Amino acid sequence: KEKLDVPIKLQEVDAYNGFAKKVFIKLNEKVEMINITCFGKKVGFDRTNSGIRVFFSVPYKHKEKTYKCFLETKSYSKREILVIHVKKYPYQEEFLKVPKKHVDLATKDIERWKKEVLELKKVYEASILKRALFTEPFARPLPSKITSSYGKRRVFNNKKDSWHSGVDFRARTPTEIPSSNRGKIAFTGHLFFNGNTVIIDHGLGIFTMYCHLSKINALVGEIVPKGAIVGISGNTGRSNAPHLHWGVKVAENWINGLSLIKQGI
């Protein structure tokens, strides 16, 4: 079993709701590692020469408050290793017009959506947590204009209220859509809201999602390099114009993918 050290000094960091963060923790006491949990969820981590890198994310709906991360080991049931001071990010709002069928859902559509939620839950539960499949930093999928930013409160047809869990890029059809980093294709298929979708597992609890595609160019289980063309842009699912919805999930939370890139993760 892998042995790592437990830190002496408790670290403290600031983080916005909806953002991901990488923290290096220096260790100095040999123990058998099991898990690291933040916000009650297991988070990704890997080993370096003098410690571990922890990859956590702050849930979008979390309020300004102080939270703690814990290390679980064979020697200690739980030990505090990190204190996170959550700060509220000033997200915007927008009003969108989409086909009525995507707002006032028929019973069959609700049942379909519920099945999709369960299917994707299994995909995310199979996440690779303690190993990275990538060696380079993540990159924006497209250099084009961002048409809708992460975290916006979204009102559909003046009645359906939600929030935007990804970043939308302008992508006229047919624009080739590249992967943001190396990883394993975890899902391909047509989803009610997201249309034709590709999901990549990058390890360390990090997933990227590419939605509304007109064509999928990937197979579940294959390892794709950074920049591999996984699909062609489109207007499938709940969409009012051709574009790419790019979603990033870290430690089970949909986060602002640009925060991942900004830190060089």
Task: Please annotate each region the language model reported.
Residues 176-187, 215-233:
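Short, well-structured beta-strand-loop connectors
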Residues 134, 186-192, 228-242:
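Flexible, gly/ser-rich surface segments that form the specificity/activation loops bordering the active-site cleft
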Residues 59-61, 74, 174, 190-191, ...:
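Short polar/acidic secondary-structure junctions
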Residues 83-194:
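Surface-exposed, glycine-biased beta-strand/turn segments
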Residues 97-102, 249-265:
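Short peripheral tails and domain-boundary helices/loops at the edges of structured domains
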Residues 1-90:
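Cationic-aromatic interfacial patches
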Residues 180-214, 242-247:
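Zn2+-dependent peptidoglycan hydrolase active-site motif and core
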Residues 40, 69, 146, 169, ...:
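Terminal peptide-recognition signature
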